[in-house]
Amino acid sequence: MDTSLKNNDGALEADNKNYQDYKDEPDKTSDVLDVTKHNSMVDCCHKNYSTFTSEWYINERKYNDVPEGPKKADVHRCTII
């Protein structure tokens, strides 16, 4: 199975939705985090993880420092379970 990001439309769709949620209501970042925890469980080449579970990943997004929305963080090639 090809797990490259270019074929990972489900993850892209979830990420875009969460970005839109963040942009529309930046004061509700925790809601976006909750949505992402439920929608972005991925099977990574190294381990299973939820996108926002790892503290370093939350810090990588730097919500408060990026007014136009969350930055994309480069992670291992993964695919939606």
From Swiss-Prot:
Residues 14-28 have a biased composition (Basic and acidic residues). Its main location: host cell. GO terms for cellular component: host cell cytoplasm. Transmembrane segments: none annotated. It is found in: Host cytoplasm. The keyword NAD does not apply. Keywords: Early protein, Host cytoplasm, Host-virus interaction. Induction: Expressed in the early phase of the viral replicative cycle. The keyword Cell cycle does not apply. Coiled coil: none annotated. Residues 1-28 are annotated as: Disordered. May subvert the host innate immune response by interacting with host IL1B and interfering with its function. Interacts with host IL1B. Belongs to the asfivirus L83L family. This is Protein L83L. It comes from African swine fever virus (isolate Warthog/Namibia/Wart80/1980) (ASFV).
